[in-house]
């Protein structure tokens, strides 16, 4: 009896490695998106603190207002920059999700094909074994009759 061999085993292994790579890229992009969201929330919180601190300052001078305005502009630019990066990351994430889905589908199709071929092989092995048993029985039966 021969062992089962799937002719596309190397392709399946390569596709599995490809799937793992796509999954790693996806996880990295998700982490980047979470990091950017955290940074954006921190910048927004800092801007809120700056605005609320304006009312709490007793003696505001021109230099103080200029400094606060410059700080507010810097925070706004940072927030806009982070929002742009977040949009870009979202687009990259959507693209990577599609790549991951395609890689997963390719692996699943090969695994299903392997399963079908294994079932066919088992059926053929069982048929051969049945045929061998029948021939053996008939040979013994014929020997006993003679």
Which ranges hold each PLM region?
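Charge-rich amphipathic alpha-helical interaction elements
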Residues: 1-146
């Amino acid at each position: 009896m021969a062992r089962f061999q799937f002719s596309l085993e190397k392709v399946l292994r390569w596709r599995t490695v490809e799937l793992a790579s796509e999954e790693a890229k996806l996880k990295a992009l998700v982490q980047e998106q979470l990091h950017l969201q955290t940074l954006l929330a921190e910048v927004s919180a800092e801007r809120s603190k700056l605005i609320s601190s304006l009312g709490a300052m007793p003696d505001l001078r021109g230099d103080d207002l200029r400094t606060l305005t410059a700080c507010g502009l810097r925070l706004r630019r940072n927030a806009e920059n982070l929002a742009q990066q977040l949009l870009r990351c979202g687009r990259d994430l959507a693209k990577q999700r599609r790549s991951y889905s395609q890689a997963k589908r390719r692996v699943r199709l090969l695994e299903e094909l392997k399963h079908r071929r294994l079932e066919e092989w088992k059926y053929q092995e069982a048929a051969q074994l049945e045929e061998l048993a029948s021939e053996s029985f008939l040979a013994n039966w014929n020997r006993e009759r003679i």
